[in-house]
Structure formats: structure tokens, C-alpha cells
Amino acid sequence: MMDIYVCLKRPSWMVDNKRMRTASNFQWLLSTFILLYLMNQVNSQKKGAPHDLKCVTNNLQVWNCSWKAPSGTGRGTDYEVCIENRSRSCYQLEKTSIKIPALSHGDYEITINSLHDFGSSTSKFTLNEQNVSLIPDTPEILNLSADFSTSTLYLKWNDRGSVFPHRSNVIWEIKVLRKESMELVKLVTHNTTLNGKDTLHHWSWASDMPLECAIHFVEIRCYIDNLHFSGLEEWSDWSPVKNISWIPDSQTKVFPQDKVILVGSDITFCCVSQEKVLSALIGHTNCPLIHLDGENVAIKIRNISVSASSGTNVVFTTEDNIFGTVIFAGYPPDTPQQLNCETHDLKEIICSWNPGRVTALVGPRATSYTLVESFSGKYVRLKRAEAPTNESYQLLFQMLPNQEIYNFTLNAHNPLGRSQSTILVNITEKVYPHTPTSFKVKDINSTAVKLSWHLPGNFAKINFLCEIEIKKSNSVQEQRNVTIKGVENSSYLVALDKLNPYTLYTFRIRCSTETFWKWSKWSNKKQHLTTEASPSKGPDTWREWSSDGKNLIIYWKPLPINEANGKILSYNVSCSSDEETQSLSEIPDPQHKAEIRLDKNDYIISVVAKNSVGSSPPSKIASMEIPNDDLKIEQVVGMGKGILLTWHYDPNMTCDYVIKWCNSSRSEPCLMDWRKVPSNSTETVIESDEFRPGIRYNFFLYGCRNQGYQLLRSMIGYIEELAPIVAPNFTVEDTSADSILVKWEDIPVEELRGFLRGYLFYFGKGERDTSKMRVLESGRSDIKVKNITDISQKTLRIADLQGKTSYHLVLRAYTDGGVGPEKSMYVVTKENSVGLIIAILIPVAVAVIVGVVTSILCYRKREWIKETFYPDIPNPENCKALQFQKSVCEGSSALKTLEMNPCTPNNVEVLETRSAFPKIEDTEIISPVAERPEDRSDAEPENHVVVSYCPPIIEEEIPNPAADEAGGTAQVIYIDVQSMYQPQAKPEEEQENDPVGGAGYKPQMHLPINSTVEDIAAEEDLDKTAGYRPQANVNTWNLVSPDSPRSIDSNSEIVSFGSPCSINSRQFLIPPKDEDSPKSNGGGWSFTNFFQNKPND
């Protein structure tokens, strides 16, 4: 090899030198190089040399070195291998490998000389342990087996550790393959140690898939880690493959069968079938299929839940068949809890425990228990179905002679696992006795009895502590503890004393050991009545004098059971004085009263109770009662069920105090009960089952002296006050316009139910059928309340009321226990007559005063009133007849009323008063209203009669009245006032003397009708009396024109005359100015006369 290296280096050196010298001729150099290389190759093929030396070891003792032969050599090549070490050694070989002993640390020169037909060649190598590889021999599987029930593979092989000089660590790599396609399922490592000898190794693996489902393959290899070897360490080759396959031997097609697994685990089921599987179910759930070899399939279940007690079905369905199995998912046994061992009779030990969590496995898969006693090595087993939750298990273990301490171990096992619990006990301290039986009671005397019972077991070595329960009727139970020594025959006896004679007792008993572990259960109850004895005390006595004071009544109370000591048959009553002793015949029970006729001497009364055994000591009481003049009745109130009575200490009281009480409604002598209190006491609480709330009781406190009893205090009271049950009965005694006097009666004591504290009187306005006063305590401002705290007051006057008003009155009584019901009444106050008179007089007086003042004012202002409201000359502007519509008057030229146009009246109608002048016979004043036909009045109710007025022109004579009428005539409203203002007729004498004195209204002229020429004097008189003067000469007027409507048509509604007139008055529109003109004497009444001034007024 070194020669080859030299040969290769030489041409390179020559080429390099030639290149340096002849760099100019590149082509020539290249050709020369190729030629020399080819020559060198041919030369090398001819000579050759060994190369690629490689050394390995598989046991660290021998190195197996090999190299590659020179090229072109054949089988006839020999090799000489020389190793340069402390002593040169050479080996002649005909092959390319050599086994040499392992060399120590350091570098070694290896020379390999090859001898062949072409010659020889030599190669030198440097060999060191670091260039050596440690490759273990290929391992061999000795055995591969399977447990198909558990789907477990078991592997066995030999590590050949005897060939290794040193202790080494070995890593084994195990590969598990599945199916014919050899899919990798598991690759694990297994560590062992080489210890200088051949060792068999075992490895097992539980498949997640039943081994029946598919073929499984296993192969292994190893890796040796030696601390003393510095070379390269490599894996060995894989061992030959071993396989496991299932050979069908039954009709079973689904695996695994009846598998028990842990809840929450994953499991694979498979179906080995020649038919195609269509579906798979676990319970009611479909599962996806996993295809294996052929038609075999599998399903994977993850995190399986707890199954029912009968298991969970797994079903595979093919076209023609159904195959299946059952799976049981549960838990391993829990550690036994509350393990306890005790004994009832020191013959058997009972160990009990709580199994803890339910495993959900029953039947053959249920948990089995084994109780092992380690000192003796004995054990007992329990195998049973799974217990319900919280149920305790028990195992009986027979006690061993002369052994008191036991060490128990309780083992629990089921297909999923194991658990255990231990306990160490001294059994004599863990005794839980049986329930005592055959419990009996027998009399010893009236105050002692004997108890006997049976307790199974041999307790001769221990002592018992027994508790006896003693209970009397209506009394607190009593416990007594007794210690007794244990016996072998199980019969026990004990005596009880300090009992009461003639008393019904109830007994029961339970026992425990003196060291105490547990009480036994109580025995059955046993009732027993003790025997009688003489009464231990005399009866409690009291006496009362009869109402006539001649007989003394003696009372006594029945003796309580604890003092009677038996059934009382009779009583002996006797009375004695300094002079004599008097005894009564025996008084049979249950009579507790006797009456003796005594005089006023002092006697001592004795009462003795007797039963079948003997008599009681006598009870004595004095008959004399010491008077007490300074005695007041007091009030007391109880507190709940009793009443507290107190008094001052009195050293004169030598014996005791007696408190007597009774219902106050009972007749004399009053006695319900009594109580005696020691003489050094100053208070007591009286309680009785007969006390009732709201009932008044009388209490009497007596003090005892040698010579008799003295009444110290007299009290009335209630155990509890209540509100009255009835309302006070009240009436109205008197009623006035502003007050009401009411009076009420006392409430009976039985209905009062407490001490009366006052009355509440409500009053307010209200009617009988209204609800205004229904709620009395609502705080209404219109309801007044009077609180009457003086209970002696029986009347009340309510003042400041309104007259003729209805009032609602309510009266209620109250105690400290509450307010009683109400009694109501409605009362109406009387009417106030003074007020009525005043109410009438005041308006009348006001009216009179107003009238007088008005009259005085009117009289003083009569001139102003006349001028203002009714002047002598009315203002035409105020005349209603002249108030025309402005628009009509201004907008029409046909209206010519009061216009100064020349016209000649056709006819004049004169309205005048009666006078001395002759009347015009053929001239009449026509009232248009009166003469209007009824049908026209209905058709035109608002039409007015219009008369024409036109002041004549003196200078001009109108020849043609018709033309004037045709030209238009002014019209004036005319009203007939003749009947309204007709004056009273005067005697003819007065008429002759004053022909015009009664005229009220005068027309513009007054002309005689019969003669056109009158006496001048008469004419002057007429002029003087006339109230209105026409503006023109009256002599020129035509009174009646031949062409007037009146002369033409007597039924015409149009009446015309020359002078205007007022339609609302009969006075002259223009009165005379001279003072000498005669004045109207008021021949007729008119409104103006009311305002005329009288000169004599």
C-alpha cells in the first residue's frame, strides 16, 4: 500500500517539475502525463499490495482482522502477517483474515506481505484498540411462546456471557411485528449485565390485540457497553425471526372471550372469520372495523366505561352469522377500610371491614378476602358476591387458647388486582358484650330489690362495669354503675337499695368490660312495684271557720306517693283542748275534709293518715285565728305561670306561713288551695295547674304563732291580665245644643279579666249608616279621644259641640292586658234657638237699615234723580220711537219722517183726556194695535202703525192733497194710551169750572168740533192749559181733510195728524213756560208723580 502511494506520488512530482520547466508547451505535457499514468497502472496491476485492514471483536479476547487482497491475485496468493510487539511474531496465511489475541493498549505495526505469481507486495498498517470495532455475535432466540388467554408473548434467549472477560452492560433491542406484512408493533429495549457466564433471559409482552387475531413476529439484537474497551461499539445483527400464530381449535370466532379489564382502559376485539364481517357493536354503539389478514377484522375500544353486573356484549355481524363475546369492566379491590376486630364472648373474634369502592365485578369475578393471623399462621377466607355500597363484611376467627394478642392481615383479590389491610389487637380489651337476657327483679324489702340477668360468654378473667337505669313515673331517670367480676356460667346478680316504698320503678341494664370498649345494648325494660311502708309524714292540713262561725272545717291534702308509702285507706281526725279531746270516726279516702262543731275555745286539730302497714305522724293545727284590724286589700299580678308574693320578716312568727288562694267568684268560705312556707322565708312563688289567665284570685297570707294564725295580708290578683271581653254599658243622660252627658256602668269582674286602668271615649261627627268612625285608632284628626284614668268616674260631659249634628260615641275599657271591645251610640244634638232667632233678625234688620238709608238718599237726591231718570222735557235722543236704523235712514230717500216738507194732512186724530169741551162725535182715535186683525197680528207681530206728520206751511195753501200724498208722507208711530191713562171722572160741577184741569197729554191743538168759532175767553183758557204749542198757527190747520184716509176708508191703519207726540208719555212734549199756567192736579197715576216735588213736603 505504501508502494502504491510512492508510485502515485512520483509521476505527480515529475509532471510538476516538467510543468515548471516547459510551461510553454501544454499539449505535450498533457500527453506525457496520460502516458505515464497508464504505464503506472499497468505496473501496479502487475505488482499489487494488501489494503483496507479492518479489525473487529465479538468477545474482547480475540480480534478478527481482515483486509482486501491485491488486485489481480488469485487463490494461490500467500500472506505473511507480522506483528511488531515485544517479540516479533509472524503468521503464514492463505486467506485475507486472521484472528489475533486482543492487543493491549498502544499502537502496533502490522506488516502484510502478499506472495503471488507476479511477485510480492508489502503493506504496513498501524493498529490500535481504538481502530477495533466491538460487534457482538448475532443473538439467537431460544424460545418464543404465547399465552393466548392473556394475549402475552414470552421470549427466552442466552446472552453468552461466558465468553466475555469483563463485566459489561448489554442493551437488548426487541422488535415485535404483526401480520404477514410485518408491521412494526412494538420496539423496546431490555437492559441486562454480562457476568462471565451464560445467562438465560426472559421477556414478556402483553399485546393490545388478541394473539389469535394475527400472526406475530419477534427478533432481537444487542449492544455491549464495556468500560474497559476504547474501540468502536456497534449493534449486533438482528436475530432470526420467530413467529407465533394461532391454530383454530374450537368454534370461537371472537377474541378475547369474557375479558375482565380495568375501567378506563383501551381494548381491542377481533373476529377470525372466513366470511366478510359487515359491522361490529359494543353494547349499542357501532365501531369502525380494522382489517387484518384475510377476512379477519378488529375493533378498538378506548376508555371503556364500567359495565353492568352481567357484562357488556360485543357483537360482530356477517352476512350469515353473528359472533360475539362479553366484556366485564370494573375496578381492582379497594383497600379494606375500618378494619376492626372484637369479640362478644371471648370465644370467637369477629373482624369486620368496609370494602370501600365498589368493583362492579360479581360472581366468579368478585373480590375474595382472606384473613390471616401471622402469629399462628391460621387463616380464614371469605368469597361472596359483591356487597352493596357501605355494607360491612365480617369474618369469624376462632380464638386460640392462651393467646390474647392477634395480628391480622386482610387480603383482598379479584381479577384486576390485590389489596390488604392489617390490625394488631389485644382481644381482652376489645370485648363487645351480648345484650343481657333473662332480666328479672325481686323484692328484698320496701326500699331494696335484687336484679339478675344472663350474659353469654366466658368472662372469668375480666371484670364487668354495668350501668343500671332506674326510672320512676313522672320523674327524672337515675343511672347507677356497679362493678362485678366475670363468671364462666354467664349468670349475674346485683342488689339495689335506697328505693322508695310502694313506688313503680322501671329497670334496665347494659354492661361493658372494665377497660371499656363498647357498651352492650340495653336489656329489655322491667317494671316493678316496691312493697308498702308506713306513711313517713302527716297530711298537709288547713282549717276554715264556716260562714256562721260555729263549725270548723278541716282540710287536708292527699299525701304524695313518696310520703304515703302505700295506698292510704283512711284518716283519723281529732281535736283536743285543755279540757277535753274529741275524736271523729275514721274518714275513708278519698275524702279530704271534715267538719267539727266547736265553741270559741282554743283547740288543736290532729289529722293522721293510715295505710295497710301503719299510720303517719299526726299533723296538728290550731283553731284560733288572731284578728288583724289594720288590713288593706292589695293588687298583685303574676309572671307567666305563677305569682310572686313577698312580705317582711316577722320574728313573732314561730311556726310557719300559710298562703291560701281561691277564685274570687266563689262563695265563702273561699278555698282553692294553700301552701305552707317556713317561718324564715320572706317570699314565695305560687304556681298551680288550675291558674288561668284573666281570672281574678284572692290571696291570703297567714302567719303562725303558738296560739293560732293571723291574717297578715289580703291580696287580689291575676296570673296574667287580659283585655276585657265586654264593653261598658253607657247611656246618654242629657243632650243640649253644644254638649252631651253620658253615663256608664261598671263591668263585672268575671268579664273584666284584669285590673281596670281606665276608659277610652271616642267621639266625632258621623251618621248611623256611614263608616266614618269604623277605624277608631287610625289617627283621624276629626276624631277626638278622651282617656279617663279615674276608674271611679262614671259620667262624662262632652262640650263644644255643634247644634243639630249627629255624633258617633264609642266607649271602651282597658286593662294592662289590652283594650276591650267597643260600645257605640249615635246622638244628635239639639237645635240652637237663640242662634236661629239671631239668624232671622240679622237679615231683617239689615234689610230695614238698607231700606231706610235708601229712602233717605232718594229723598235728598230726588231732584237729581228726577232730572236724571225722568225729566219734564225728555231728550229726543233717548226716545225709542225715534231710534231708527242708521243705515236704513241714511241710505233711503223715501224715509221723510220729521222732514219739514209742505204737506196737507188728510185727517187728524186727536188723543185727549176727558174735558169740558164737547167731544167730536164723528172723529175717533183709532188704535192700530187694537184694530189690527188677528190674522195680520199673527203674520206681522212686529209691524207698527205709522201716522204721517208734516208741519203745515202757513204762507202756502196746498190745493191738491192727493198729489202731496202721492209725493210721500212721513210716518210716526202712534200708540193708543187712552185706556192706560184715562183719568178718574170728576163731577159735572168740577168739569164745568175746570174744563181742562185733568188733561194729561194734549195734542198740538185742541179745537172744538161742533163750532169753528169759540168764545175768546174759552180759547184763552184753552191756551193756558195746553201743554204743548204747535210751531205754526193752529188756525190755519186742516183738521179733517176730505181726502184723508180716515174719511175715505174708516178701516185704514194709517192715522195722520198734524202734530207729533210721544208714544211713551201723556205729558206735553213742550210744557208751558209761564208760571201762571195751571198745573196738573194728578187726575191719574203716573211714574213721574213719584219723583215730583211736593211743596208742602
Curated annotation (Swiss-Prot):
A motif (WSXWS motif) lies at residues 519-523. GO terms for cellular component: external side of plasma membrane; extracellular exosome; plasma membrane; receptor complex. Residues 49-138, 335-434, 435-534, 538-629, 627-719, 724-833 form the Fibronectin type-III domain. Residues 1086-1097 have a biased composition (Polar residues). Disulfide bonds join C55-C65, C82-C90, C213-C270, C341-C351, C466-C511. It is linked to Stuve-Wiedemann syndrome 1: A form of Stuve-Wiedemann syndrome, an autosomal recessive disease characterized by bowing of tubular bones and other skeletal and craniofacial abnormalities, respiratory distress, feeding difficulties, and hyperthermic episodes. Most patients do not survive past infancy. A chromosomal aberration involving LIFR is found in salivary gland pleiomorphic adenomas, the most common benign epithelial tumors of the salivary gland. Translocation t(5;8)(p13;q12) with PLAG1. Belongs to the type I cytokine receptor family. Type 2 subfamily. This is Leukemia inhibitory factor receptor.
